[in-house]
Amino acid sequence: HVDSFLAQHFPRGTGFATDLPAPNDSGDLPLATVRAFSIDDSATTEIDDAFSVQALGERVRIGIHIAAPAVVLARGHAVDTIAKSRMSTVYAPGLKYTMLPDAWIESLSLNEGRELPVLSLYADVDAETRDVLSTESRLERLRIESNLRHDRLDAIVTDTTIAEAQFDSPYAEPLSTLWHVARKLLASREQARGRPEPAGRVDYFFELHGTEE
């Protein structure tokens, strides 16, 4: 099945040419003044989103930041052509074929300590009711302060500890804020739908070791 899939979707092979140009600089974009962090499992090497939380008196500004490779990728660029032909990264148990070359992924992944181009959605919410008051989108550079990992938080983050931000992490307050806002948005969706969203679904995670396909 793997050979058949590869023959259909990667007729020229899964690798990349060795002479592809490097990404352009995104230094002309304004730099966001937020403390941004990502949340992924420890096996994630392509970090493509991050969050930020700012206390603004009676409001809280939540930032959702998405990596923006297109900012440094001109239309018709050799890597643009490759990305359009692949359309996405392919994930399967034990297999991964990326949409972009490794050098580009490394250059554009939202790794901590770096400043990278992102598309940001900011939502101002009421600090008490957690209602969304306004939203704004920006194209900007973002400095990633930290890459948090699910598997290192699972043992200390529960519904009880996150509700009160009572766990050992410098991001306890921001994570608690995100949790409360997410619960408020969930309640709003359920009210609009007239029924609760499905609950109790198990999120499976598989970690495979070895090089054999």
Locate predicted features.
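Boundary/activation segment at the start of structured domains
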Residues: 1-10
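Short, flexible coil/linker elements and helix-boundary hinge sites characteristic
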Residues: 10-11, 27
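Electropositive polyanion-binding surfaces
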Residues: 16-213
